[in-house]
């Protein structure tokens, strides 16, 4: 149940999961909100890190084309851009970039050899934010095993314990 203005209503959704024995990078869950008016409420979407949405998910695989084939089985409502070092899949809501290990390390070269890549994995999550103010306060004192890179357009965190890069871009 969701309570809005003192009135309880039932939020409804459907989920589909793809287990990690099929998609080697990890588990994937899709959630279709059947009552979006009870979920996507502006006052519930704000956070002190000012993140408004997920811009991109990167997946690392020794064969990015095989991942593309799996995505094509899930939906045909996508735009595909194949380049030499990355395959980009765009939906109405998100961008998924498929890399091999070498190309991913090149994109995130600021972290050098600190990136510990597996053959198949989720590599990074790019989030849109309206301000870097809160993010600039985060440092290695706050989080164990964290590396940070910043320029005028983005702030990147390598969370070594989770083997994941969080990238924040300003909108």
Predicted features and spans:
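Glyoxalase I/VOC metalloenzyme domain signal
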Residues: 1-171
